[in-house]
C-alpha cells in the first residue's frame, strides 16, 4: 500500500516538473532533485512507525519524478541534442552500474550488522554531499554545445 504514495507523488511530480523545467530550466532545478530523497533518509533515521513508509516512499517518488525528466533535459540544455544518444547511453550504463554497486554495498552493510538507521545515515551523508556539490557548481552549469 505504501508504494501507492510513491506512484502518486512520482506522477504528480512528473506533471509539475515539466512545467517547472519550461519556466526555470533543468539546470536550475537539478540542484533541488535530491532534497526530497535526503528528507526521506531523515524520515528513516528518526521515525520507526510503519506509517512512515508512506512518507518515505512519497519523498522518493518526488525525487524519482524529478530525475526522470531532468535526466534527459539537463543534458540537452548543457550539450545540445547532437550527441544526446551517446550521452544517454553513457548515463544509463553508469546508472545500471551504480544500481548494482549500491545493492552490493547495502548488502555488505546489512551483513556487517548495520541497522537500517545507520545505513540511512550513511546514505544521508552521501546525498547531502551531492546536494552541497551541486549548489557549489551551480553557476558553472552553463551550455557547452559541442
Question: What are the roles of these predicted feature ranges?
Answer:
Residues 7-15, 96-100:
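Residue-level signature of mid-helix packing/kink "hotspots" within the transmembrane helices
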Residues 13-25, 110-111:
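Helix-to-loop junctions at the C-terminal end of transmembrane segments
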Residues 28-42:
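Structural signature of the two symmetry-related core transmembrane helices
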Residues 46-56:
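Helix-loop junctions at membrane interfaces in 12-TM secondary transporters
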Residues 66-79:
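Intracellular juxtamembrane helix-capping segments at the cytosolic ends
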Residues 71, 121-146:
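Multi-pass alpha-helical transporter architecture, strongest
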Residues 81-113:
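A late C-terminal transmembrane helix in Major Facilitator Superfamily
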Residues 108-126:
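A membrane-interface helix-boundary motif in multi-pass transporters
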